[in-house]
């Protein structure tokens, strides 16, 4: 015997929420793949300075997002199917998966908040080391290539000190030239551009995480209410 009345409304409401959750998983998976293959981040994070690769903390986070998106799509499908079939077993499994996902999201959110500036800091240190080598050593071709890639990708020049900026503009054409010396001298520094690049992407990820967390809370409540409704309906 199927559920009736308010419980039936909850059943279809849970189905709708799960469909939205499934779509959200697809969006997160798509955004993560876009961030993974975004030309700006790819150009910078594939660089190597001698034996030292560029910091890969950002990509670790992206791979986690890809996994989360795929799991969300699976869990969303499980919830849709469990709601339509009115299966207590599937709904219980769905609820357990949601609790685990929610706990992981909270833990990841805390870690991300604590380390939100670390990614940009690591990339800036990598850039500063390459810039220093390129300025000091005329034969540091690898360092020059790294610096020029930063400058051309971000359309910036030098770090956040005027002395380094002026030196790097005048030294070995490391900065992209606009044909105007004054414009080159006052081109935005790369530290600001690096902060802008990563803070924008982290902001996007944060909004997505909050939306998903709200949906998950509603789904956990609805799945338990529906599960209880199914159990009660089978008694009568």
From Swiss-Prot:
Subcellular location: Cell membrane; Basolateral cell membrane
Keywords: Adaptive immunity, Cell membrane, Disulfide bond, Immunity, Lipid-binding, Membrane, Transmembrane, Transmembrane helix
Disulfide bonds: 156-190, 157-175
Any Gene Ontology CC annotation: plasma membrane
Topology, Extracellular side: 34-63, 113-201
SUPFAM superfamilies, sorted: Tetraspanin
Membrane topology: Multi-pass membrane protein
Molecular-function GO term, any one: cholesterol binding
Coiled-coil features, chain-numbered ranges: none
InterPro entries for the chain: Tetraspanin/Peripherin (IPR018499), Tetraspanin_animals (IPR000301), Tetraspanin_CS (IPR018503), Tetraspanin_EC2_sf (IPR008952)
Similarity comment: Belongs to the tetraspanin (TM4SF) family.
Subunit annotation: Homodimer. Part of a complex composed of CD19, CR2/CD21, CD81 and IFITM1/CD225 in the membrane of mature B cells. Interacts (via the second extracellular domain) with CD19; this interaction is initiated early during biosynthesis in the ER and enables trafficking of only properly folded CD19. Part of a complex that includes MHC class II/HLA-DR molecules and IFITM1. Interacts with IFITM1. Interacts with IFITM2 and IFITM3. Part of integrin-tetraspanin complex composed of CD9, CD81, beta-1 and beta-2 integrins in the membrane of monocyte/macrophages.
Function description: Structural component of specialized membrane microdomains known as tetraspanin-enriched microdomains (TERMs), which act as platforms for receptor clustering and signaling. Essential for trafficking and compartmentalization of CD19 receptor on the surface of activated B cells. Upon initial encounter with microbial pathogens, enables the assembly of CD19-CR2/CD21 and B cell receptor (BCR) complexes at signaling TERMs, lowering the threshold dose of antigen required to trigger B cell clonal expansion and antibody production.
Domain remarks: Binds cholesterol in a cavity lined by the transmembrane spans.
Name recorded for this polypeptide: CD81 antigen
Organism field: Bos taurus
